[in-house]
Regions:
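N-terminal signal peptide c-region/cleavage motif recognized by signal peptidases
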Residues: 5-7
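A cross-kingdom marker for long, charged
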Residues: 234-303
Length: 303
């Protein structure tokens, strides 16, 4: 019988109940937009990674909205078998060390290598670019141990049996193969951005998190740490950012074709970037209701 309670909103709930859910969602201390098409209501929550572990924000409003939604969408996830995990453990050194006894100085420009060494206080490193980028981002305030927004929501959907699914699934063996075989040169933009974030310092990283909580979207996207998180993401390193955009645009269109309320936890940059999801929806005549996601136009000087 418990399975029948959560999905009932779309079919039986009066409009005032739906409006109450939307009002609850608007209290979320995170970037959130409401989009409607006919009988469909889509609540887009823009998430960022690396939030401080001890950061306080109103998770109760988000969980309440998720509890009463008809369905929830999560970011793309990878699903690995025990064999995949075993392979990763077996080749752990490949994941964490540069190949053939090389160091970072063999791949980075002299100027970038000097910046990295100044930040880490060490000479050329044999750590892989994946490990080095993570170390630099932590110097910029990125918290790898923090709980992601999607993880918080996923727990809520399991507790209340709200229908939920990722917008896409990666096979574990394909994911691991790409990570293990990607040449270090593919990480150069990532290392440059991560070094810039580290140079900005943990205070700038903390301000990014605060701007996210206060829904200051342009400031979040312009922060060095957010740019580094984007440049060092799987999708950027593997040159598959366009694939991610396609996946999310398809998922959003599908959600807006279904009756009821859908809550989607999506990458903030993908939503708010120029020609991103929000721009596309607006161009199609829909009205994303929420914080302004575009930078303010420069003020015209008086003549």
């Amino acid at each position: 019988m418990a399975l029948t309670t959560a999905p009932a909103v779309a079919q039986d709930a009066p409009s005032d109940v739906i409006e109450d859910i939307v009002v609850t969602a608007r209290r979320i201390e995170a970037p959130m937009w409401e989009v409607r098409r006919g009988d469909s209501v889509l609540i887009l929550v823009g998430s960022i990674d690396g939030l401080p572990r001890k950061m306080e924000w109103r998770t109760d409003a988000l969980i309440s909205a998720v509890d009463r939604a008809d369905r929830v969408l999560f970011p793309v996830e990878g699903r690995a078998s025990l064999a995949d995990v075993g392979r990763l453990i077996w080749r752990f050194r490949t994941l964490t060390r540069l190949p053939n006894g090389r160091t970072s100085a063999d791949y980075l420009s002299p100027a970038l290598e000097a910046r990295v060494e100044s930040l880490t206080g060490e000479g050329p490193t044999r750590d892989s670019m994946l490990i080095l980028s993570g170390d630099l981002m932590e110097l910029g305030g990125y918290s790898s141990g923090g709980r992601p927004v999607s993880g918080l929501v996923r727990q809520a959907t399991r507790a209340n049996r709200t229908p939920a699914e990722p917008v896409g699934i990666f096979r574990g063996d394909e994911l691991i193969e790409k990570v293990l075989t990607t040449p270090p040169e593919r990480y150069l933009d990532c290392i440059d951005a991560a070094a810039t974030a580290a140079e900005a310092g943990v205070e700038a990283g903390a301000q990014r998190a605060e701007n996210w909580r206060l829904r200051r979207i342009p400031e979040v996207l312009d922060s060095p740490l957010e740019k580094a998180a984007t440049a060092c993401s799987y999708w950027s390193v593997m040159a598959q950012a366009d694939d991610l955009r396609r996946i999310w645009n398809t998922a959003v269109d599908k959600a807006l074709a279904e009756t009821g309320i859908t809550v989607a936890i999506a990458p903030l940059r993908l939503l708010a970037e120029p020609n991103g999801v929000l721009d596309r929806l607006e161009a199609e005549g829909l009205e994303p209701i929420g914080p302004e996601w575009r930078p303010s136009a420069p003020a015209q000087s008086a003549r």
